[in-house]
Amino acid sequence: MNYPHPIIAREGWPFIAIAAVVALLIHFFAGFGVSWLFWLLLIFVVQFFRDPARPIPTQANAVLCPADGRIVAVETAHDPYANREALKISVFMNVFNVHSQRSPVDGAISKVEYFPGAYLNAAVDKASTENERNAIVIETAGGQTVTSVQIAGLIARRILCYVRAGEPLTRGQRYGFIRFGSRVDVYLPVGSRPRVSIGEKVSASSTILAEL
């Protein structure tokens, strides 16, 4: 598969370089008996910033999962970004999941909004409305509205979003990154049919969240 991003996300390169230099210096001056813990830390940092290619389903009405993680909510809720009632599906990412975000559908971005906020545990419901977050609202060619919200967590303190209003997105396209544990909420039209359940492990792009 042609994936236009390195398998280790660019967002992690500075962290990996720092961890590698520290491990090397401690190994050189103190030996492996002391440095092994720092080599383990380097391995953890490298695996955290991995960003592998994923197969993308071709089903026309499929809404793809925007992130790796575990489903923590499937419910009817108000979408405050598109001002409507919606089907809300939430994905919680722990520190061992891939943390890049990918577009759930093909469409054009009608809105991008950033909100400063708290850093509560991203697995709890109130993180959706109280934590730092960034929302993109996507309009599909069929006139359906899909909202994808990046939410910072207890450890995550940096949301990165690389798209702007008016730009097109294709399903599976990488559009953002959240560092060190977080959550993504997806709001869909009320009539959408969920294909996942609470507690299920999901993968970015390759898991179908719902059908429009």
Swiss-Prot record:
<keyword id="KW-0865">Zymogen</keyword>
<keyword id="KW-0443">Lipid metabolism</keyword>
<keyword id="KW-0594">Phospholipid biosynthesis</keyword>
<feature type="modified residue" description="Pyruvic acid (Ser); by autocatalysis">
    <location>
        <position position="182"/>
    </location>
</feature>
<protein>
    <recommendedName>
        <fullName>Phosphatidylserine decarboxylase proenzyme</fullName>
        <ecNumber>4.1.1.65</ecNumber>
    </recommendedName>
</protein>
<dbReference type="InterPro" id="IPR033175">
    <property type="entry name" value="PSD-A"/>
</dbReference>
<keyword id="KW-1003">Cell membrane</keyword>
<dbReference type="Pfam" id="PF02666">
    <property type="entry name" value="PS_Dcarbxylase"/>
</dbReference>
<comment type="similarity">
    <text>Belongs to the phosphatidylserine decarboxylase family. PSD-A subfamily.</text>
</comment>
<comment type="function">
    <text>Catalyzes the formation of phosphatidylethanolamine (PtdEtn) from phosphatidylserine (PtdSer).</text>
</comment>
<dbReference type="InterPro" id="IPR003817">
    <property type="entry name" value="PS_Dcarbxylase"/>
</dbReference>
<keyword id="KW-0456">Lyase</keyword>
<keyword id="KW-1208">Phospholipid metabolism</keyword>
<keyword id="KW-0210">Decarboxylase</keyword>
<dbReference type="GO" id="GO:0005886">
    <property type="term" value="C:plasma membrane"/>
</dbReference>
<feature type="site" description="Cleavage (non-hydrolytic); by autocatalysis">
    <location>
        <begin position="181"/>
        <end position="182"/>
    </location>
</feature>
<dbReference type="GO" id="GO:0004609">
    <property type="term" value="F:phosphatidylserine decarboxylase activity"/>
</dbReference>
<dbReference type="GO" id="GO:0006646">
    <property type="term" value="P:phosphatidylethanolamine biosynthetic process"/>
</dbReference>
<feature type="active site" description="Schiff-base intermediate with substrate; via pyruvic acid">
    <location>
        <position position="182"/>
    </location>
</feature>
<comment type="subunit">
    <text>Heterodimer of a large membrane-associated beta subunit and a small pyruvoyl-containing alpha subunit.</text>
</comment>
<keyword id="KW-0472">Membrane</keyword>
<keyword id="KW-0670">Pyruvate</keyword>
<keyword id="KW-0444">Lipid biosynthesis</keyword>
<comment type="pathway">
    <text>Phospholipid metabolism; phosphatidylethanolamine biosynthesis; phosphatidylethanolamine from CDP-diacylglycerol: step 2/2.</text>
</comment>
